[in-house]
Amino acid sequence: EAQADSPSFLVAAFYAFTSLSPVALESLLTDLPELARREQVVGSVLLAPEGVNGTISGPDQGVTAMLECLRSRISLGDAHFERLQVKRSRCKSQAFRRFKARRKREIVSLGQPCADPRRNVGTYVDPCNWNELVDDPDTLVIDTRNSYEVAVGSFVGSLDPATDSFRDFPDWVEQHLRPL
């Protein structure tokens, strides 16, 4: 049972690159807002043919119901959404004003039709090995966040492509990394 001064709302952030059929996408766009209303959940869920990306907030049972809905209807190839690690935190008041489920062309806007994050992925780095990797002088770290976010803080020695949006990153790669 929650104490009176402890945060009472659960916040869940999640994403998955997986194929969503047009039927599954439309069904979720219809069903998620109704479920969110019923469960008093607010936030945003982006749905695209390449997957799902969202952050939601609400009572524990409401957030759990939303995640269960997604788990039951989204497959990650031979894995299931239930095996996806959802990042959870708590807050004292609702983190968002309303709930929106939206259709997008991409869940991460890159604007490159040949880029398919469901098929072309890098090497997974275990968190235990992260510091060793970024401290290696042969590792090139590029901070792909926008200029404002990089100004707040970045990894020591990382390259700042000075982009306004992640969508600008492919052009920067063509101009600066392809010649290497």
Label each region the model flagged.
Residues 1-180:
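Cytosolic catalytic domains that perform sulfur/thiol-centered chemistry
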